[in-house]
Every structure is written in C-alpha cells, then in structure tokens.
C-alpha cells in the first residue's frame, strides 16, 4: 500500500458517519463519538486435538482472509473426556487494527456477507452491553480470497467488532451506519 492511501470505509467514517452519529446522540465532545477499535477473528479447531495437521489449514485460511499471520491458541488445561492435553493447539486468532481492520470490514460487508446463501441479515441482539458486536460464520467459502477448490473442510469463525461505544444503542448505530446488514 502506498503512503497516502486511506481505506474507503475509514474515509466514509471520518467524513460522513461521525457527523451523523454526533447529530443523533448530541455528544458534548467529538472524542466521545464511537469508532471501531479492533476486529478479532477467531477460528476454533477442536478436531486439531486428534489430528495436529488440521490447525495448518485453519492458519492458512485465516492468513488469506485477513492478510495477517494468526496466533495459535492452545488449551489452557487438560480435559480427558475430549482427549485434550494442556498446550495442544485448538484454535487460531487474528486481531486486526488500523488500516487492515478497515479493509477487512469493507471486504466483509461488501463482498463476503452478500455471498452467503439465504442470507437475511445479522441479528442485532448480539451486543455485549458495551457496544461490542460478535457474530459467527458457519463456513469460510464466502471470502473470495480463498480458492473454493483448495478448501479442505468447512470451518466456521467468530468475528468480534470492538467499538469505543459506551452502550448497545451507540454501537448498533455505528455499525448500521458502517453498513452492517442487521435484520429489521
């Protein structure tokens, strides 16, 4: 990326969305206007406890989707019923901030979500009380970065959008303005 490049969604947030949110909630200070802090993409691979090669596919998929190397998540304690030992890899996580975060959100909203079959919108009840939003995707094939023929198995993922909003209403308004397709 060149030095003077600004992601499209970030430009829209700075020019239009901040003003809209300020009019809607009438903040005393412009620093109170909520924004997106980070996006965390988590992919749990429970089967990796039995077959250690499965984690590599998840790492490759997450790298292609996010453009960043994932962090391997390991089991904190052993659970005999799941044949799980402490320290075994059971997932992968990527935390996106800055321009990569804005690019990922733009691709997610404009390309990936519309490609989901029978997609009727995201639930607007999955906020955590502090304006952060988490939703799950059942498979990774809707991302155009992945070659559908090279996907070895469908893997779901959780995506958490962390905002600086103080409550759910502010977070919901911010994400709706950004273009999140919530159900009516």
Curated annotation (Swiss-Prot):
Instruction: Please give one Gene Ontology molecular function term for this protein.
Output: rRNA binding
UniProt keyword annotations, A-Z:
Ribonucleoprotein, Ribosomal protein, RNA-binding, rRNA-binding, tRNA-binding
Q: Which GO terms describe its cellular component?
A: ribonucleoprotein complex; ribosome
Annotated InterPro entries: Ribosomal_uL5, Ribosomal_uL5_bac-type, Ribosomal_uL5_C, Ribosomal_uL5_dom_sf, Ribosomal_uL5_N
Q: What is this protein called?
A: Large ribosomal subunit protein uL5
A Pfam match is Ribosomal_L5
UniProt record, GO biological process:
translation
Assembly behavior: Part of the 50S ribosomal subunit; part of the 5S rRNA/L5/L18/L25 subcomplex. Contacts the 5S rRNA and the P site tRNA. Forms a bridge to the 30S subunit in the 70S ribosome.
**Keyword RNA-binding: yes or no?**
yes
UniProt record similarity statement: Belongs to the universal ribosomal protein uL5 family.
Q: Does the record bear Ribosomal protein in its keywords? A: yes
Q: Superkingdom of this entry's organism?
A: Bacteria
By which gene is this protein encoded? Answer: rplE
Q: What does this protein do?
A: This is one of the proteins that bind and probably mediate the attachment of the 5S RNA into the large ribosomal subunit, where it forms part of the central protuberance. In the 70S ribosome it contacts protein S13 of the 30S subunit (bridge B1b), connecting the 2 subunits; this bridge is implicated in subunit movement. Contacts the P site tRNA; the 5S rRNA and some of its associated proteins might help stabilize positioning of ribosome-bound tRNAs.
């Amino acid at each position: 990326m060149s030095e003077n490049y600004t992601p499209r969604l970030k430009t829209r947030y700075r020019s239009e969305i901040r003003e809209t949110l300020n009019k809607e909630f009438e903040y005393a200070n412009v620093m109170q206007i909520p924004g997106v802090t980070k996006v965390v993409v988590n992919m749990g691979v429970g089967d990796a406890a039995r077959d250690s090669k499965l984690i590599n596919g998840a790492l490759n998929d997450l790298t292609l989707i996010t453009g960043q190397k994932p962090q391997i998540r390991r089991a904190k304690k052993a659970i005999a019923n799941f044949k799980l030992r402490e320290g075994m890899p059971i997932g992968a996580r990527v935390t996106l901030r800055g321009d990569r975060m804005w690019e990922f959100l733009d691709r997610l909203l404009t390309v990936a979500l519309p490609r989901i079959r029978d997609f009727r919108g995201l639930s607007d009840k999955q906020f955590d009380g502090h304006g952060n939003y988490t939703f799950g995707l059942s498979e990774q094939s809707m991302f155009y970065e992945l070659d559908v023929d090279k996907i070895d198995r469908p893997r779901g993922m959780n995506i958490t959008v962390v905002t600086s909003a103080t409550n759910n209403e502010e977070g919901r308004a911010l994400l709706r303005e950004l273009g999140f397709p919530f159900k009516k």
